[in-house]
Each structure stands twice: as structure tokens, then as C-alpha cells.
From Swiss-Prot:
GO terms for molecular function: translation elongation factor activity. It comes from Oceanobacillus iheyensis (strain DSM 14371 / CIP 107618 / JCM 11309 / KCTC 3954 / HTE831). This is Elongation factor P. Keywords: Cytoplasm, Elongation factor, Protein biosynthesis. Belongs to the elongation factor P family. Pathway: Protein biosynthesis; polypeptide chain elongation.
Length: 185
């Protein structure tokens, strides 16, 4: 058990028989009445975000999340195969479970699989990934000074806005939290 006064961003807790990750929290001490902790939590099973308020000092169970380094192998229909890099065990995860992360995952990429009591909750991605441009309009000479952008399709099917000087075949660094172009690799 852990006190809500000890909340930290990223902490995983068990509340109402579900697994939640603390996104934001704030200790509130009103002039009148008891102190409380206002928090914003993400459900690790469904991905939903919910605001919850706890009385100061209230206890919740800490969820012991396991992170395993795994390598993405291939997709077979809607199932996606991953291999543990230490034991070489393979697991399959359904596409609907990791739909948002699939836009950033390519074959042979190492990711962290998040699980709780042998139940797979999702995939943790690195902050940035390198992806190759498969389709974009050619840059027109003189456009580089205007500072505009154009759409580019990447090898995973993700479409991002990139500067005019980016061409097909370029390798780009993409931020996985917002899906935006960072730089050329």
C-alpha cells in the first residue's frame, strides 16, 4: 500500500480493480476543510484518462508492472509477434491492443512490453524513432527558405508534416509522443 501523498508522475497504482498510471497530481489544501490530492490517471488496460480525487493520506495499492525488452518480428493478420531478447520466447499481441504504437514500430525494432500479472497491457516506445520516407512530393528549388511543410508517408504508414527539403528515402527522427517530425537522422 502507498499513500496518495507519495504520488509521482509515472507511478502505477491499483484503484477500483483496475491498473492506473499517474499522469498528473496536485496536493490541494483548501482554507476550509480537509486536504486532498487531485490526480489525472491513465487506465493501462483501456487507455482512458480519468480525473480522480483522493483524501490526503488515503492508501492505494501499488501495481507492480513488469517491463520486458522484446524485439518486434512480424505481423500475421491482426496478430503481432514479439520475441524476448533474453529467453527467445515469442508472444503475440493483438493489433487493437497496441493500435496507436504500431504507427512507430518496424520489424526488428526493440521495444518494452508492459505487463501486469502476466496480462499484457501494451508497448512502451522510445521517445524518438527513426523511420524512412516512402512517399512525398519532390521539393521545388527555392522552397527551402519559405519554411513551409508538406505531407510525407513513412515506412510504417504514418503520415507526418515535414519541411520541403525532405525527399523519398530520407531517414527521419519522429517523436513518438506526438507523432511529429524532429529532424533528419
Amino acid at each position: 500500500m502507498i499513500s496518495v501523498n507519495d504520488f509521482k508522475t509515472g507511478l502505477t497504482v491499483e484503484v477500483d480493480n483496475d491498473i492506473w498510471q499517474v499522469i498528473e497530481f496536485q496536493h490541494v489544501k483548501p482554507g476550509k476543510g480537509a486536504a486532498f490530492v487531485r490526480s489525472k490517471l491513465r487506465n493501462l488496460r483501456s487507455g482512458n484518462i480519468q480525473e480522480k480525487t483522493f483524501r490526503a493520506g488515503e492508501k492505494v495499492s501499488k501495481a507492480h508492472i513488469e517491463n520486458r525488452k522484446m524485439q518486434y518480428l512480424y505481423a500475421s493478420g491482426d496478430a503481432h509477434a514479439f520475441m524476448d531478447t533474453n529467453t527467445y520466447d515469442q508472444i503475440e499481441i493483438q493489433g487493437k491492443q497496441i493500435q496507436e504504437q504500431l504507427k512507430f514500430i518496424k520489424e526488428n525494432m526493440e521495444v518494452s512490453i508492459v505487463s501486469y500479472e502476466n496480462e499484457i497491457l501494451g508497448v512502451d516506445l522510445p521517445n524518438n524513432v527513426e523511420l524512412t520516407v516512402t512517399e512525398t512530393e519532390p521539393g521545388i528549388k527555392g522552397d527551402t527558405a519559405s519554411g513551409g511543410s508538406k505531407p510525407a508517408t513513412l515506412e510504417t504508414g504514418l503520415i507526418v508534416q515535414v519541411p520541403f527539403f525532405i525527399n523519398e528515402g530520407d531517414v527521419l527522427v519522429i517523436n513518438t509522443s506526438d507523432g511529429k517530425y524532429v529532424s533528419r537522422a
